[in-house]
Amino acid sequence: MIAPVTHLATATTTLPLDTAMPAPVIAQPIVSFKDVTKRYGSFTVLDGLNLDVAPGEKVAIIGPSGSGKSTLLRVLMTLEGIDQGRIEVDGESLTHMPGRNGAQLIANERHVRKVRAKIGMVFQSFNLFPHMSALQNVIEAPVQVLGVKPAEARERAAELLEMVGLGNKFEHYPSQLSGGQQQRVAIARALAMRPKVMLFDEVTSALDPELCGEVLNVIRRLGSEHNLTMLMVTHQMGFAREFADRVCFFYKGQIHEQGTPAQIYENPQQERTRAFLSAVREAN
């Protein structure tokens, strides 16, 4: 089991239930967003965002559509650039690199690839290679990107597919797998790169309830058995409450409110948070 996150400042962990939790003070965050702004034309999707995540912490990100949740993950994975600010992963800047005489330069592609290798991401769509079997999908990146020997990559891929409950599907192609099975292959593929941080972007949104449960069970197991830091964008409120160490409610490109699951779900302090959770309950 992952040990409880004990290196947050105690002031953030001793608040009564009816007090909104401030941003925790984390001495050595594994992920850090510092004044990050991202714009699409005149629309600001991330607005001076600040967020630190502790090693091994599981953070659920909730909020209405268009609030910046998925963009947060996409800029962390460098699928999108940022307009302002700084992002760090495991003590290294993802957006800048050291230059001469202490100068900070915009990170080049080589530097970005090195830092980004510490991150794995699973998307809403499975994005599997349709012409490759489940096993080949998991083997491909370690061999081509990390230079892992094929035999070693195959052994690791087999272990991961067993772990996600697909030990009997090695040679099946994506078209022969259910949506839940494809998503579990995608999780195994991300884990094959041995990331320190895992990102999940609405990974159950395209699945029916039964298949959704299959995927959430795998993520639950990852959280309990592996020392991975996880950031999950989700509308699965029950799962987020059970799974997360911290819940961040996004609104208009900022963290509008954050706290423990009990604080956010039982006694949110901000009216916009209360309205969102009420709408979710009514929809369900």
Task: Specify the residue positions occupied by each region the protein language model found.
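ABC-family P-loop ATPase nucleotide-binding domain
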Residues: M1-T37, N284
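ABC family nucleotide-binding domain
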Residues: I26-P261, Q269
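C-terminal boundary and immediately downstream tail of ABC-type ATPase nucleotide-binding domains
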Residues: I2-P4, L8-A9, Y251, Q258, ...
